[in-house]
Amino acid sequence: MKVQVQYSILLIVDEKISSSNQVIGLAEAIKIHKKEIKIKILYSHKLVPTLLPNWMIYYLLKVNLINVKSKFEYEKINLIISCGRVSSPLSLFIKEKTQCKNIHILDPYFKRKEFDKIIIPKHDKYKKSDNYIEIIGAIVNNNNKKISLEKIKFFKNKLSI
């Protein structure tokens, strides 16, 4: 009898509903291809000061002036999916602690090369990089908050999950 290993995804979002919809949509697409998934949501705007620039948030996390361990234990995480400016330093910090992969939706505004994948809308016209995935439109349809089958296939191929 084959025992399936649980795949653990941490979603990091800011206070915007659109950010939550995008990370949940991508997690749902991954869930279709993996049977046993554990999903946890972390709200970055409740953990870090949102008015600070990303580099400063990241630095404060590194030197333990912002302590997220009390709010979140570094359990076994296979993947982090984050969206929103303030979520990106938290995503990188936790990635370093757990040695997992991470995907950021939209521009993280700093340390772009340290993200495994960054999902960017094609209309934003960023300079191409190996870790960028360009998409047309949003990950999820705002009307029904579901990801299309075409996008599920697209992400499965691009993310190698």
Tell where the protein language model's regions lie, with residue ranges.
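Glycosyltransferases and closely related glycan-assembly transferases
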Residues: 23, 31, 75-79, 89-103
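N-terminal pre-catalytic "stem/leader" segment of glycosyltransferase-like enzymes
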Residues: 1-65
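Short His-centered aromatic/hydrophobic patch
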Residues: 83-85
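Short, well-structured alpha-helical segments in soluble
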Residues: 61-76
